[in-house]
Amino acid sequence: MSLENFGNFLTLDEKHSFIKKYFKEFYTKDFKLFASKDKHYRTRAELSFYHENDTLFYAMFDPKNKKKYIIKYLDFADEKICTFMPKLLEYLRQDNKLKEKLFGVEFLTTKQELSVTLLYHKNIEDIKSNLENLSNILHINLIARSKGKKLIFKTENLRQTLNIQGRKIFYEFNNDCFIQPNTTINEKMITWVCEILNTQKRMDLLELYCGYGNFTLALAPFFFKVLATEISKSNINFALKNCELNNTTNIHFARLSSEELSLAIKKEREFFRLKDIRLDDFNFSHVLVDPPRAGLDKSVIDLIKKYENIIYISCNPITLKENLKELSLTHRVEEFALFDQFVNTPHLECGVFLSKV
């Protein structure tokens, strides 16, 4: 979440100064700061197209007036995206069928791979052969979308490898998954959690909002058992696949919302999706939450504050502060980290470790 409502904070030092004051009622020790490289740090980019005089340009929307402006280069985007952008544009300009009613493009990269999604205001079945030629000639994983339709050429799944404390963690996901869009910062974030766990007495882990297992796979070796929940069926399927890729056998996934899990743990409701999982077999010493911008609702806070240790990854300092007002009644902030996920913007990712008072 942007800090622009509080001031024009762009550098990590400026963000740090603001956060230090903003959270002073909860934390007065030193913050850990994790910087990103200044350029080519972002693995996802979404662009519009501008059509003029029968040719095509990449474009973005000005957030102030909502008007399109032409762009030629994205210095924040991964090098693979920057290298491929002119190749794709040149190809599209030469194919009238591909160019017609094309309104957007999404790029997604990992350390190894790149996928491209083209967005159309027309029936993409009519240009299927053109799209296939594009994929083959430019050697690219291609997805095309229009209303109610989706075509995939080669594959929509990407492989990723993260280096965490000398270990390689393998992942597979696609463009529909929520991903941390700065791989370097993602590795630093996971490593920060691992370094904290190295000093802890650990039993089992409860993780909410696990996605495709970004944190789950890296943290599993620290615990006897892990229960990870996620509402997206496709994310759960990727998480199960990622367990296979890493030969990990101590993670149990449940397709439940955090509110449903709360009801199940309190034995207020039974869920068929938990038929193979005995909640009473878990002894949670730690809980990890990585919620959306809205933060945690009261039912989730009431659930997690029962546990000894809480790791809270936040993309919104505003809702984080609101949640800490509740959590600080039972827990104390022991560590606070700032991750400069989006360089030279007012956005900031926070990591907080709390232990029971």
UniProtKB/Swiss-Prot annotation:
Catalytic residues, chain numbering: C315 (nucleophile), E349 (proton acceptor)
EC number of the protein: 2.1.1.-, 2.1.1.35
Keywords attached to this entry: Methyltransferase, S-adenosyl-L-methionine, Transferase, tRNA processing
Reactions listed under catalytic activity: uridine(54) in tRNA + S-adenosyl-L-methionine = 5-methyluridine(54) in tRNA + S-adenosyl-L-homocysteine + H(+); uridine(341) in tmRNA + S-adenosyl-L-methionine = 5-methyluridine(341) in tmRNA + S-adenosyl-L-homocysteine + H(+)
InterPro entries in the cross-refs: MeTrfase_TrmA_AS, SAM-dependent_MTases_sf, TrmA_MeTrfase, U5_MeTrfase_fam
EC class name: transferase
GO biological process: methylation; tRNA processing
Record-listed S-adenosyl-L-methionine binding positions: Q180, Y209, N214, E230, D290
Pfam assignment, any one: tRNA_U5-meth_tr
This protein's record includes keyword Metal-binding: no
GO CC terms of this entry: cytosol
One MF term in the entry's GO annotations: tRNA binding
Function recorded in the entry: Dual-specificity methyltransferase that catalyzes the formation of 5-methyluridine at position 54 (m5U54) in all tRNAs, and that of position 341 (m5U341) in tmRNA (transfer-mRNA).
HAMAP family linked: RNA_methyltr_TrmA
Sequence similarity: Belongs to the class I-like SAM-binding methyltransferase superfamily. RNA M5U methyltransferase family. TrmA subfamily.
Protein name in the entry: tRNA/tmRNA (uracil-C(5))-methyltransferase
Gene that produces this protein: trmA
